[in-house]
Amino acid sequence: KLRFRDLELVKEELQFFLDHNVPQVKFVDRTFNCKHDHAMAIWKYLIAHDNGITNFHFEVAADLLNEEEIALIRTMRPGMIQLEIGVQSTNPDTIREIHRKMDFAQVSETRVQEGHNVHQHLDLIAGLPYEDYDSFGKSFCDVYRLRPQQLQLGFLKVLKGSFMYQAAPEYGCVCQSREPYE
């Protein structure tokens, strides 16, 4: 079950960062924009209280961004936010197997950066189930065609308690028992 932090508390915390000219604040929950009203309230607050310095990094599900959210994002000053989009893979079998939901066709249609004010980086992960050399190459080309400012390649981390941790023996995964769990 998803929990959402009280908006008034979030605004107080954000104001602290803004008042202290913190260079960057990261929201590292990929479900940030799963609740439209919550995301919009935070983004509107940031626009209204922008200090011209602080950059906010959001992990978002691009296939969930709607036109109202995209329109609001396009009003932000250049450099105010950056979006990280965890594609992981464009192989539907892989996405299904790792219990993710993502509509890559919808991600491809989402045109946040047409406003030229948002830095976007898209992530891929090497080593996922059903992802071989050719499949990963296709995922890379699919994401590269979207022309993000940054394409980040990560290696599979098998975190304790995760689906991949439990399924590691089935896939023959060998990983470190200590950080970074690669």
Q: Where does each model-flagged region fall?
A:
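Residue-level detector of anion-binding/catalytic polar loops
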Residues: 23-24, 119, 149
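Mobile, glycine- and charge-enriched loop segments
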Residues: 1, 108-132
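Radical SAM [4Fe-4S] cluster-binding motif and immediate context
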Residues: 1-114
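Short, hinge-like loop/turn segments at secondary-structure boundaries
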Residues: 43-44, 139, 168-172
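Catalytic cores of alpha/beta
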Residues: 67-73, 129-147
